[in-house]
Amino acid sequence: MATSKSGGSSKNGRDSISKRLGVKRSGGQFVRSGEIIVRQRGTKFHKGKNSGLGRDHTIFALKDGVVEFKTSKGRKYINII
C-alpha cells in the first residue's frame, strides 16, 4: 500500500500555435503582383480593384501598384492603384 496519495494530472499546459494573421502591407506601400496584403479569417476586409481573394480569405495583389484602404457602406475595401 502506498504511503503517499498519488497526485492528479494537470488540466493546463497547452497552447495553440499562432496563425500569423493580420495586415501584411499598409496603405501607401508599393506591392508587386501576387504579394499578400491581408491574412484573415472571414472577410473583415473585402477585395477591391486589382486585388484578389484566396480560398482562406487572404487578399493579395493582382497587379503591381500602391495599396489603398477604402471604406464604403460600412465595408473595408483594399484597392491597388
Swiss-Prot record:
Molecular function (GO) terms for this protein are:
structural constituent of ribosome
* Region span, Disordered: 1-26
Which stretches are tagged as biased composition: Polar residues?
1-11
Its GO CC terms are:
cytosolic large ribosomal subunit
Q: What are the entry keywords?
A: Ribonucleoprotein, Ribosomal protein
Recorded hits in Gene3D superfamilies, A to Z, give:
2.40.50.100
- Give an example GO biological process: translation
The record's annotation in InterPro entries points to: Ribosomal_bL27, Ribosomal_bL27_CS
Q: Which family does it belong to?
A: Belongs to the bacterial ribosomal protein bL27 family.
The record's annotation in HAMAP family points to: Ribosomal_bL27
Q: Which PANTHER family match?
A: LARGE RIBOSOMAL SUBUNIT PROTEIN BL27M, RIBOSOMAL PROTEIN L27
Protein name, entry field: Large ribosomal subunit protein bL27
